[in-house]
Amino acid sequence: MDADFWLDRWREGRTHFHQTRVTPLLQKYWPTLDVPAGGQVLVPLAGKSLDMVWLAGQGLRVLGVELSQLAVEQFFDENDLRPEIHQSAQGRHYVAGNLELICGDVFALEDATLAACAGVYDRAALVALPEPMRKRYAREVYGRLGRGCRGILITLDYPQDQMEGPPFSVDDAEVQALYAGHTEARLIDRRDILDKEPKFNQRGVARLDTLVYRLERLG
């Protein structure tokens, strides 16, 4: 996935991945992480996700990263927030209370920014990336998070030869390989969601599971 592909999706309104509600799996499993109040939570490829509003409501400082300026502006407009804006080497920062979105490339985040994160939430980032980028993403983003950083990762597992991504299939074997050596990825939930995803049914996908992981950055 290159930047133009992602930006075109937002410009053309092809954003079926955007949910109009908070993710129930986030609400169920995030409290088990015990991320300290006031801790900074990274949300990569954030779009305009309502999950960020929920996380902020838990007393956390949310740091979303999103390439599309349109998505960032829609997030603040749709949530009646008026952000302060400033520029840095990491991108264009939009800040409103304990919500901050950087309009920029997640790979441009500085070491200090990632090391300061106490938590990470990834519902739509890893599965949006083709395989070569997934390896780089796990290494250069997760590999630079601070020791003890905890998070929730949600992926999809389906026969990749039955549908072209994104979202891509990222099964448990790949997750373990991607995070080996720097992050513990423990599978805590797996459920069949094929009957809830008509797009996959229409394309002839025979099986579709969602997988939920508890992540912890190792020392």
UniProtKB/Swiss-Prot annotation:
Keyword entries, A-Z: Cytoplasm, Methyltransferase, S-adenosyl-L-methionine, Transferase
EC number: 2.1.1.67
Domain of life: Bacteria
A biological process from GO: response to metal ion
Record-level Gene Ontology MF annotations: thiopurine S-methyltransferase activity
InterPro entries, per database record: SAM-dependent_MTases_sf (IPR029063), Thiopur_S-MeTfrase_Se/Te_detox (IPR022474), Thiopurine_S-MeTrfase (IPR025835), TPMT (IPR008854)
Any one GO cellular component localisation term in the record: cytoplasm
Catalytic activity: S-adenosyl-L-methionine + a thiopurine = S-adenosyl-L-homocysteine + a thiopurine S-methylether
Family: Belongs to the class I-like SAM-binding methyltransferase superfamily. TPMT family.
PANTHER family named in the record: THIOPURINE S-METHYLTRANSFERASE
HAMAP family per record: Thiopur_methtran
Name recorded for this polypeptide: Thiopurine S-methyltransferase
Encoding gene (name): tpm
